[in-house]
């Protein structure tokens, strides 16, 4: 079907998102579980954003990029989870035509931005480890700002094309989407006519946005690993690998789940698999990322304690413990 000669007909005013069909009591359980997951995601990522903003020791490109990535995670998870929570308590589970495509646009734009941000963070680690002497001269404030703007805007600009094309398909009958988000694949399946051009453009966008950033990250870390292996000191090697380990874990979680969704062959239950994989990279991964980034990072853990107001209490407890130990030692001597 030729796109230019196509007549757009929208008799469908809303869609039905089936989500996870189950007994009403299970729907309440799902609501509780995902409410907790969403709250923890917001708290964890907001804590990182505040830590980077308030702690001057974290005003370096690596942590500034991490703070922006955490803010991006908040936006990313907010495009889907609030509507999913509302559907757990709703009997109609409907979403308007405009809201559905708005969710599609923002969800995939933020997801695309995450891929680009992971590339930028890999590039920053490459410069810091492979070009340490030139790092301050290359990673200037202007370059860092430009990379941040690029990371936020690129997905929104590039995903306009597939969203507009899919929204212009004729929808004149079925309106039930067996998913918890407005995913483009079931949306195209609901169209009254098959448009191979739109499907090809969407598939091309997916391939470019998944494989391109992933290959860039692999190449960056291949060079990083070679540079680390040439380091003479074992302590330097451990520090370099520790710095990159958290970022690599996030890359594997995000790109691994996305590629399972869009690259791997279909299973016996493709629809259910799609839901679970989408749930993993849209809800579980943003929940785990704050823990991954702060688990082995002393500077981040110290800054997070300040944000949570626990550092002062920890210091007081340590001082009291030292005081009691010194008193006990003195009494034993006397």
Outline where the language-model segments fall.
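Transmembrane helical core of 7TM receptor-like proteins
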Residues: 1-334
């Amino acid at each position: 079907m030729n796109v230019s000669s196509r007549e757009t007909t929208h008799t469908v005013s809303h869609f039905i998102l089936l989500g996870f069909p189950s007994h009403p009591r299970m729907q309440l359980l799902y609501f509780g579980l995902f409410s907790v997951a969403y709250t923890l995601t917001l708290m964890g990522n907001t804590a990182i954003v505040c830590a980077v903003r308030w702690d001057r020791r974290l005003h370096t490109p690596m942590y500034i990029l991490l703070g922006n990535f955490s803010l991006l995670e908040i936006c990313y998870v907010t495009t889907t989870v609030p509507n999913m929570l509302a559907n757990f308590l709703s009997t109609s589970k409907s979403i308007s035509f405009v809201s559905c495509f708005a969710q599609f646009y923002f969800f995939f734009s933020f997801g695309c931005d995450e891929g680009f941000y992971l590339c930028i963070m890999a590039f920053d680690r490459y410069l810091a480890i492979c070009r340490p002497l030139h790092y301050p001269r290359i990673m200037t404030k202007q370059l860092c700002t430009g990379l941040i703007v690029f990371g936020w805007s690129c997905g929104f600009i590039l995903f306009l094309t597939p969203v507009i094309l899919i929204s212009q398909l004729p929808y004149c009958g079925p309106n039930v989407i067996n998913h918890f988000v407005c995913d483009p694949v079931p949306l195209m399946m609901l169209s009254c006519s098959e448009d191979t051009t739109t499907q090809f453009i969407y598939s091309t966008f997916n391939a470019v946005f998944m494989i391109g950033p992933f290959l860039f990250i692999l190449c960056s870390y291949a060079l990083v690993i070679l540079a680390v292996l040439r380091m003479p000191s074992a302590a330097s090697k451990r520090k370099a690998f520790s710095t990159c380990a958290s970022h690599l874990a996030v890359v594997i979680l995000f790109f691994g789940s996305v590629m399972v969704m869009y690259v791997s062959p279909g299973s016996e239950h493709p629809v259910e698999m799609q839901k679970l994989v989408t749930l993993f990279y849209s809800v579980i991964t943003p929940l785990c990322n704050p823990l991954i980034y702060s688990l082995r990072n002393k500077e981040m853990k110290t800054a997070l304690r300040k944000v949570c107001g626990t550092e002062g209490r920890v210091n007081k407890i340590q001082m009291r413990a030292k005081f009691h130990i010194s008193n006990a030692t003195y009494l034993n001597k006397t």
